[in-house]
Amino acid sequence: MLERTLRVLEYDKVKEQLLEHTASSLGRDKVKRLMPSTDFEEIVEMQDTTDEAAKVIRLKGHAPLGGIFDIRSNVKRAKIGSMLSPHELLDIASTMYGSRQMKRFIEDIVDNGAQLPILETHVAQIVSLYDLEKKITGCIGDGGEVLDSASDKLRGIRNQIRTAESRIREKLENMTRSSNAQKMLSDAIVTIRNDRYVIPVKQEYRGVYGGIVHDQSASGQTLFIEPQVIVELNNALQEARVKEKQEVERILMMLTEEVAAEADIVLANVEVIANLDFIFAKALYAKRMKATKPIVNNERYMELRQARHPLIDPKVIVPNDIVLGKDFTTIVITGPNTGGKTVTLKTVGICVLMAQSGLHIPVQEESEICVFKNIFADIGDEQSIEQSLSTFSSHMVNIVDILEKADFESLVLFDELGAGTDPQEGAALAISILDEVHNRGARVVATTHYPELKAYGYNRNQVINASVEFDVNTLSPTYKLLIGVPGRSNAFEISKRLGLSERVINRARNHISTDTNKIENMIAKLEESQKNAERDWKEAEELRKQSEKLHRELQRQIIEFNEERDERLLKAQKEGEEKVEAAKKEAEAIIRELRQLRKAQLANVKDHELIEAKSRLEGAAPELVKKQKVKVKNTAPKQQLRPGDEVKVLTFGQKGQLLKKVSDSEWNVQIGILKMKVKESDMEYINTPKQLEKKAVATVKGRDYHVSLELDLRGERFENAMMRVEKYLDDAQLANYPRVSIIHGKGTGALRQGVQDYLKNHRGVKSFRYGDMGEGGLGVTVVELK
């Protein structure tokens, strides 16, 4: 990629945002060296890798990458024999611990069923160095001090030091507490000078204590003297400290040699953890932007759905759909300056650069991107003072370079093409330059304010005009991209809104050719038509989504209902069988007892009486079990099905009406308010409803059958309520009721709305209304039946 392209598209600013999500200098180094790739397979793998990390972030919210350091230089020094400091060794141990934790973290997620093949491959390369890690942390404390436990010798030496220090302090404190000391000492304290314990003695009492003078105060009135009585003790203390230093250095050197022995493994682990830090930084950045993984294709087209510029506040940015490479390979965005054309241009460029860098991009899911070998951008004022080039010349130097290199694998972005010179000549140059790159097969997005290019897309294949919508009421751009609609200046409308008189505006219109006016009016109508079409499409799309959601929910509820019904039937059947089995066992026991009594001649019981008793006991078996054992074969001839027939859908156990045959073996069936495809093999014919023969209808019910004039649903769950409404309306129609009432209460209104939505689609409902004041008001729906 050209450095200039990366600069004008602000690629480095994206990297600066990405840097904020790294956990270590290792990851930061990777980000700083990040560049877009041009290899298709590599880009696909990078996108998949970022997607796996994003999945981990969704599952866990974070990745345990704390405590990771760039220890590469320390490890290399250890290899050549340099002794590492305690803090350097602690950094190595901390990084080894972090690597081990990261490995276990990913493996645990995989063990729980997540599919992370790429991350799993990464962490598989991490080699645990637990023993070395523990050896370092066992010898060095969190503050960087070598611990007494590092060796027995060090513990013994430090015990000697503590004993010597205690004896010295004891002697000196005794001296400072004596009555004579009060007048000879500047202060009754024990202090240290040159690593030796001393007391502050007044100048005039210098000879009282003897010993060695190590320092004096700024005034010279106080001498810091090591009394003669502790000189030997101080000497012993110094010797012990020298031994301590030697032992500490020996321990550090020993640990350094341990690190050197595992240097290659440590460095390999560092490289893996650096990659993981970089990968998870990309995932966290994607989460921050609400970015998604684009589909990468090699068909040389892109489809960015609701694309946003990553560097603009998402609260103010207007997302746009941008398609390039399918029906058209060149987009020319026309219209006035400050209309958001450059933002659209930069959005395309930066999204491509990010995608080819393995970053997710700020677009909706299912967006597609292709791989470009070169991305060229001529954006902004690149005037060179040193070369004394004008704005036009500066742009032209860049355009000449682009024309030398652009080919069918290039994306070319032109901002205000042909600007900075005579408008007529600039427009002519712009058209010629666009023709050149377009004919080479490059993908091109260009912006211009020249009116001559408004018709550019109408007489060339695979070229389309576009514009950025402008609201003349607010005198500001909406930043909404209108594909297929060229831009217009809006100068007259803006001037009118700002108070310019109609007389002046009308005279200005007369100076414009009739053709130009026609074009402007045509563009205005196109803009209005496109806005209306988009609004209608959004409304239709929203209704479609709601319908699909309702359809899925109803299907789920029906399936759950039938599963619950079957489960209860099976449970009841099992309980019945258990009771029957218990009765049979009891019968067998009674029969055995009677036979034993007969053998013992204590009872005169005949065999036929035993058989009769057993038959009576078997006759007590519940009907459910008996019916299950009897399989009745349906020998009725198969009914020829027609639209309008009522059938029973066996899978759901529900009654439905045939709507339309959609294949040799499938029908569209209306089950309540739900429409679905059902196979003929899953239906059972019920009847064909007669057409409008209401007078001849007679309903026969059993003596005890009664249908109430009202149905009370208060306290019912929504699903149960809907099933009760369906059955109640069927029963009310069979009873020839002209009107019924459904009591749903007021509450939150959810049940009321559900009931009325159901009534709208019920074929037996003529009309419905809320109840009057005496009927229950909003808590009741009165239904008129057909």
UniProtKB/Swiss-Prot annotation:
Its EC number is 3.1.-.-, 3.6.4.-. PROSITE patterns: DNA_MISMATCH_REPAIR_2, SMR. This is Endonuclease MutS2. Residues 711-786 form the Smr domain. NCBIfam families: mutS2. InterPro entries: DNA_mismatch_repair_MutS_C, DNA_mismatch_repair_MutS_core, DNA_mismatch_repair_MutS_sf, MSSS, MutS, MutS2, P-loop_NTPase, Smr_dom. GO terms for biological process: mismatch repair; negative regulation of DNA recombination; rescue of stalled ribosome. Homodimer. Binds to stalled ribosomes, contacting rRNA. It comes from Bacillus cytotoxicus (strain DSM 22905 / CIP 110041 / 391-98 / NVH 391-98). GO terms for molecular function: ATP binding; ATP hydrolysis activity; ATP-dependent DNA damage sensor activity; endonuclease activity; mismatched DNA binding; ribosomal large subunit binding; rRNA binding. SMART domains: MUTSac, MUTSd, SMR.
